[in-house]
Amino acid sequence: MTDAKQTSPRRRRSWAEPYKIKVVEPLKITTRAEREQAIAQAGYNTFLLRSEDVYIDLLTDSGTSAMSDYQWAGMMLGDEAYAGSKNFYNLEASIQKYYGYRHIVPTHQGRGAENILSQILIKPGDYIPGNMYFTTTRLHQELAGGTFVDVIIDEAHDAQSLHPFKGNVDLQKLTDLIERVGAERIPYISVAGTVNMAGGQPISMANLRAVHQLAQTYGIRIILDATRAVENAHFIQQREEDYSSQAIATILREFCSYTDGCTMSGKKDALVNIGGWLALNDYNLYEEARNLIVIYEGLHTYGGMAGRDMEAMARGIEESVQDDHIRARVGQVEYLGQKLLDWGIPIVVPIGGHAIYLDAKRFLPQIPQDQFPAQRLAAELYLEAGIRAMERGIVSAGRNKETGDNYYPELELVRLTIPRRVYTQAHMDLTAEAVEEVYHNRDRLRGLKMIYEPKYLRFFQARFELQ
């Protein structure tokens, strides 16, 4: 007789999110005719859609995450004093504990920090090397008189490359630039982890350490875009053998230790709807930043944020570095990406941290890049299922500030960005099925013509019409 207790080992078939849902928001389901009218009125720009006309909103993970009960409880403890809010000191302590920087200046969001940083460090004629551009970062650098220079590894520009750290800096490219223009014309090296425009790709700890050593040789600062540094820490834990047994919080602190400061949009990793910061180790630079904050953002103890929002961010930072949280967050992105790969749909690989990036060049090869294939694909996905995604290609790349010509990036992508703790596995299934349906009918799609182009960051407000 078989002993009932003697059973063969069973493989775990699935995983579940490390949270449960307390509050829900109804979603509006629209008809195809309603979506056709909405996207036409929006000029085929998903940024110009009304949120009430969107079923699943994958435009961005910026400020769209769900806060926890712990964060909401903190909102009730908001100290709204104009000066010296206790919530600022809680936020400052949380940043110092988990990121390790000495001096903190709060800002209303990440681009507020980018603006202040650019003003205190960049002068006309400077060069800022970095591991791929980001839209707002590069614009602030250019408005201050600087020129961004891409020194990311070549694999980052290849959507099909399986390099595990496509966010790595090419040390030879960086060295060549320093030798060519001189260290005195490089105010800092701009490092992002993860790299948004490359597909949410991470930079390795070993590579950042090597960049740090090179920068020290020449006396150049490193400034981190820490917006998704927690996600980057997760990839280091998963892909660098020396860190496989270390906690995310430990990895994050070492990662930041190789840099001299950071800009931060707290609307991503820190799990809040608004807010950011500029962190610096150099006290003299901090003094300059603090003086400018009063002009552009508000007093140095609130920086454009309410006390309640600073408290929510302080608590969100604490939650963001929990291993269970980040494992599930990146796991949901991977779930969607793997489903699309299984169906043969072209996406950027390896799967990144915050989003799945559809490769519009391979998805819609019949549409030339100057007819905006990624923009067209994003519009079509909305028409198919009410899913809002974001173009990350020629429209986002903008124009050369000297010649006025379009930049033609190697990567022409549509970003399906997953907000943290918001959507279920069923939403991911529906999204995958909608993408598959568009892919099945891809041959009938034609390009777009831009009929309105704003001066700066055109992807936000540009308007298009069908060719």
From Swiss-Prot:
The keyword Lyase applies. The gene is tpl. It holds the Pfam family Beta_elim_lyase. The modification N6-(pyridoxal phosphate)lysine is found at K268. Homotetramer. PROSITE patterns: BETA_ELIM_LYASE (PS00853). Disulfide bonds: none annotated. It comes from the Bacteria. NCBIfam families: PRK13238.1 (NF009709), tyr_phenol_ly (TIGR02618). It comes from Nostoc punctiforme (strain ATCC 29133 / PCC 73102). PANTHER family: BETA-ELIMINATING LYASE-LIKE PROTEIN-RELATED, TRYPTOPHANASE. GO terms for molecular function: tyrosine phenol-lyase activity. Keywords: Lyase, Pyridoxal phosphate. GO terms for biological process: tyrosine metabolic process. Belongs to the beta-eliminating lyase family. This is Tyrosine phenol-lyase.
